[in-house]
Amino acid sequence: MTKALKNNLKRENGSLVQTTICLCNRLCDEKACGQQSFAVGVSGGADSLALVYLLREWALRCGKKIVALTVDHQLRPTSRQEADYVAKLMRQAGIEHHILTWEGEKPVSGIETAAREARYRLLEDWCLSNGIYTIFMA
């Protein structure tokens, strides 16, 4: 984060929403080159839910679109139910949502690394296929 960005953030009114909006505006000005759509990785945990709800506020105020993406790794019997629950939360919040599924056989060892690599590949492939070049993750 640049020194100027840090100083601008300090001048905001201090609320988390205002700070997030300020940060997103600065990121868009500096990096996103006029993009209208952004993706958000949402696992359903507290961090990613907080991020997507804050980004929704920013998107509404700035005329941007956010798309929430959840990866179902299919590693637990309840993983699809968990992803469906996130989909329900996003629907209630008026946020477009897609569930991406890690298909195929899973490795016996190194599962965490393989799952992370599969997650990033799925997210990147979806974004590129849909003309989205920025993804937020918590």
PLM regions with names:
Residues 2-138:
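Core alpha/beta nucleotide-donor-binding catalytic domains of modification enzymes
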